[in-house]
A protein has these predicted regions:
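Conserved N-terminal segment of class I S-adenosyl-L-methionine
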Residues: 1-167, 188, 204-205, 211-253
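A conserved beta-strand element that flanks and buttresses the S-adenosyl-L-methionine
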Residues: 173
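Hydrophobic adenine-recognition pocket in adenosine-nucleotide-binding enzymes
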Residues: 177
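Short glycine-rich, flexible loops that bind phosphorylated cofactors or substrates
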Residues: 180-181, 210
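A short, conserved alpha-helix within the catalytic core of class I
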Residues: 181-190
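Helix-to-beta-strand junctions that scaffold the AdoMet/dcAdoMet cofactor pocket
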Residues: 181-182, 195-197
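Conserved beta-strand signature within the Rossmann-like core of class I S-adenosyl-L-methionine
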Residues: 198-206
């Protein structure tokens, strides 16, 4: 579920994209990959997609370490995420930051290439940003793209209960994450504990077990959603009986 302004902004960027504009994503990739052209991008993207389609099945994957290694075995997901998120807008999240004040703390949990932080940072330069993800090519790209900004930090979770947050946040996003971890209930509890009173959480959790959408995650989905709905005030709630993607919005009570 996205706001009307987000959808309108996305439509505008899609129009620019069709006209050959909105190429900031390609400029970043070109700088990172030392002169990557649009033609080279499509060659690498196409070959990478074909390779990634069989990557999961190439080795036995039954432990958390096995699952985590999948995302470190190819840089295809850098290309895919930069392309996939090229037209995204986050006015709804920005409105939440604006209400919190000129300064604050934002965490993009499970950031990948950090598309949300990339959109927000220039609009809220006085905020402090924390990126969290596994040590993968995506996180290395995110680290590189914010290398000049001292108000952006990067954290990596350990295994199991070794989770990385140490301070409190006004806004946390945890989008397209929970279905990929073995311990979504533990992750959500960790995130909720590190929300400031009155802080906002944007989160989703699809149910589509198989491959990198872990069966371990699906088994905890109902309890995870119950924890969210019991612990936080729902603006837009998740429901266990809705398996499709819903971008939920919660607020931590001030009491």
């Amino acid at each position: 579920m996205r706001s009307y302004r987000d959808l309108l902004g996305r439509r505008r960027l899609q129009l620019l994209d069709r006209l050959g504009g909105n190429r900031g994503w390609l400029r970043e990739l070109s700088e990172y990959y030392r002169g990557l052209t649009i033609q080279e991008f499509w060659v690498r993207y196409t070959l990478g997609r074909m390779d990634a389609a069989t990557l999961w099945e190439r080795k036995p994957r039954s432990t958390e370490a096995d699952y985590r290694s999948f995302y470190a075995e190819t840089d295809y997901f850098v290309l895919r995420q930069m392309y996939y998120h090229r037209n995204d807008c986050h006015h709804d999240i920005a409105r939440t930051l604006r209400r919190a004040g000129r300064e604050g703390d934002f965490c993009e949990y499970g950031c990948g290439v950090a598309p949300i932080t990339a959109w927000l940072r220039s609009r809220f330069p006085a905020w402090r940003y924390t990126l969290v993800d596994l040590p993968t090519p995506m996180l290395e790209f995110a680290r590189w793209r914010f290398r000049k900004f001292t108000n952006v930090e990067v954290k990596e979770p350990g295994f199991g209960s070794d989770l990385p947050l140490t301070r409190s946040y006004d806004v946390i996003t945890c989008l397209d994450v929970l279905e990929h971890v073995v311990n979504p209930l533990q992750v959500v509890l960790h995130v909720v504990e590190h929300l400031k009173p009155g802080g906002a959480l944007y989160v989703n959790f699809i149910e589509a077990p198989g491959g990198e959408n872990l069966v371990e995650a699906a088994a905890q989905r109902m309890d995870t959603i119950k924890l969210l709905n019991d612990s936080l005030e729902a603006i837009v709630p998740l429901r266990a009986d809705v398996t499709a993607e819903v971008n939920a919005h919660y607020v931590k009570p001030r009491r």
